[in-house]
Amino acid sequence: MLFNIIQDVAIAHDHTAIALTMTEQTVDYIDVAIRCGYALNEKEVDFILTGCSSGLGMQLACNYVPNLICGYGTSEIEANLFASINQGNAFSYPFSLNWGWASEEKYRFVLHALFKGLNDLPYPKVPKEEVQRKIAATEKLKDLKKTAQIDFEAFAEVYQNIRN
């Protein structure tokens, strides 16, 4: 059901959706975040849609993975601002928190806003100087993240050693 929603929205915004499925029964959200990292770092995908019960554990786990910048949101404005301003490559959504009547439609609206944000220029109604300052701040954050983390290959090796 959720993947059908993702596919519909992706197609509406000229993107392709693929499901990165796992058959292991013993994986947790940390394992899923690592697999997301593999997919992005190996250029299998250019954006990840993910989530968990609250969405926050998945976001945190993804943000520990080198080269992943994962946002979180439950509203259209949060999704759009994350995509257009923070320019991350992953987005986490809560699939149990407040999930109920019409939740699938709310998720659809959030995804539309997210995909629209991926194609929007950041800060369309803000003076050019302010836009440049905010884009520079986003780039600074990305540079700091790269500096603070080991490269993905070393990270993956550490992960394998922890799992074994």
Task: Annotate each language-model stretch with its function.
Residues 1, 80-164:
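C-terminal binding/interaction regions
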Residues 1-14:
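Glycine-rich phosphate/diphosphate-binding loop of Rossmann-like nucleotide-binding domains
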Residues 18-21, 48-52:
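Short, conserved beta-strand edge motifs with alternating hydrophobic and charged residues
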